[in-house]
């Protein structure tokens, strides 16, 4: 899930309002998908001090408002198990296209540069998110670049194309 509304940031909400929006988002997700979401990313990656507790309380298994590591880990908290699936911004249509005004092809070009140069970082494993938003790349030009990016990743032997949920299952004991 990615919150009920993108213009409401948990970091600016009180606990009751954040929980009400979270529940509204869960119910909306259930209405469309027939099940509750397993994970959550706040709009703009802006959790509040209460977000982790609320996510555990409402049955979430993973949270991606984390930018501090390259691989999933369990969040150290007193409320229960919740996996952090770190989020990356390098290949994200919002900043690349909207904020910095790049042409759509920058999306694929940056991904290919990361994939080509990854071995030089001497990092054994890392997450690289391909992030597209319906209101940004949800047009033919965006679909073209997303397809090209997926094809570029599929050509690599050292790339696992997966979901945040699958990454969370690596570290979450009750998934």
Task: Name each region found by the language model.
Residues 89-110, 114:
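Binuclear metal-dependent hydrolase catalytic cores centered on His/Asp/Glu-rich metal-binding motifs
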Residues 77-95:
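A structural motif
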Residues 1-39, 44-83, 107-130, 136-175:
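Catalytic alpha-helical scaffold of carbohydrate-active enzymes acting on polysaccharides/glycoconjugates
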């Amino acid at each position: 899930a990615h919150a009920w509304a993108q213009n409401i940031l948990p970091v600016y909400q009180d606990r009751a309002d954040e929980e009400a929006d979270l529940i509204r988002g869960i119910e909306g997700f259930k209405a469309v998908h027939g099940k509750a979401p397993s994970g959550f990313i706040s709009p703009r990656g802006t959790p509040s001090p209460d977000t982790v507790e609320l996510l555990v309380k409402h049955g979430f298994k993973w949270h991606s408002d984390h930018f501090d590591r390259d691989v999933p880990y369990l969040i150290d908290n007193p409320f229960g198990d919740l996996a952090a699936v770190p989020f990356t911004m390098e290949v994200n249509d919002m900043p690349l296209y909207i904020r910095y005004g790049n042409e759509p092809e920058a999306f694929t070009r940056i991904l290919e540069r990361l994939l080509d140069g990854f071995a030089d970082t001497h990092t054994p494993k890392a997450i690289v998110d391909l992030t597209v938003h319906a209101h940004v790349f949800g047009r033919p030009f965006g679909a073209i670049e997303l397809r090209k990016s997926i094809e570029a990743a599929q050509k690599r032997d050292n790339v696992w194309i997966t979901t945040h949920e699958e990454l969370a299952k690596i570290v979450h004991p009750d998934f």
